Structures are given as structure tokens and as C-alpha cells.
Amino acid sequence: YMVVGLIVADGGSIYLDGKDITHLPIYRRAHMGLTYLPQEASVFRSLTVEDNIRAILELQKNENGKPLSKTEINERLESLLDELSIQNIRTNVAMSLSGGERRRTEIARSLAASPKFILLDEPFAGVDPIAVSEIRNIIRILKERNIGVLITDHNVRETFKTCDHAYIISDGNVLAAGVPEELSNNETVRKIYLGEEFDYPTTGKKQ
């Protein structure tokens, strides 16, 4: 919440691309390329999937600093619908979507703003196993597009399968940091947070 500006930082500094954004309001951070996807539903419930995405595109500007033309909006809309595999539900009203469909629509809306970083709050919460796999694949797509992804989630296994670097936070303090394989074998982390029964696959084997 401190990173996106929802609450004021009581210490330290927050940098984005080398710029101090600690005291900037949310909208300024968004203009700099920082997008936040909350755990709660963030779609416009009464709008269709395509209108949800279009609403964000209509606020964007092109390389010349001018609002996107109708042609540019339609081209980007079609591209996002294809990339997130939601062409088949484009005319569905958002309130009728499943958990996985809603997540994909929300991520498409986030991408419509051409972000540099996307913060995902509990992306694996409230969705079925198939949707979890789809979301992991979408996050990989974001990484391939060179978009930074910061995830906060209590689903440790799915998060470990997805991230390159992780922090384990306990009682407001960073308990440990490192790659998932290291953290899964960290005795302190297992004792305080993961539990002794926790297993995580490394090099094809369960620990």
C-alpha cells in the first residue's frame, strides 16, 4: 500500500526508475507507470469486458502526447482481448464473470495504461486451479514484455512458482529474502512461516 501511495510511508524511501516517489500522490505515480491491481474486484460491474478496457484506453495518450484516436483505441483493444484470451467474453457484463475471467479483464485494463510496473495484491485468491495456472502464465507474459511485477500473496507455493525473488514478511518485518529455492530451505522461515511440512520442487524434486 505504501508503494502505490494508499498509505503514507512512516520511514524509508520509495524509488521508481531512480526517482523518489515517496511523497507523490497516487495519480502521479500512475502517470509514471505504476499500476495497482487490488484483491477486490476493480472492474466496472455494469459494463461489458470490452467497455471496461475501452474506458481506460480513452484516458491514454499516444507518443505525441495527444489522446488516442478511435482507430488506435480499437487496435489496442483488440490486441489486449487477444493477448489475455478474452475475445469470447468481450460482450459479457463484468458482474457475470468468473473469478478467472474477472482477473484477466482486470489485468487487460492494467495493461491498457501501458505500465512499467504492476502491483498485484493476492492475484491467486478466490480463483479456481485452472485460473491460477492462467494467471501465472499471464504474469510470465508481463515479464516477457519487460513489465515489472510485484506480488503480495499468502499462496506461497503459487507465488514461488511465479517469482524470481521473494521476501517473507512476518509481524511487519522482513524475515528473509532471496530466490524461492533458498527461502523454502531456510530453517527460520520454515519454523516461523512456512511450517516444517512445507515442500517446494527444486530441480524436479520435492524438498
Regions found by a protein language model. Name each.
Residues 4:
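Helix-to-loop junction immediately C-terminal to a conserved catalytic motif
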Residues 12-19, 32:
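Conserved ABC transporter NBD signature motif
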Residues 47-56:
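Short coil-to-helix segment of the ABC ATPase nucleotide-binding domain corresponding to the Q-loop/switch region
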Residues 68-89, 137-140:
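Conserved ABC ATPase "signature" region
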Residues 93-97, 101:
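Conserved ABC ATPase signature
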Residues 114:
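Conserved catalytic motifs of ABC-family nucleotide-binding domains
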Residues 118-122:
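Catalytic Walker B motif of ABC-type/P-loop ATPase nucleotide-binding domains
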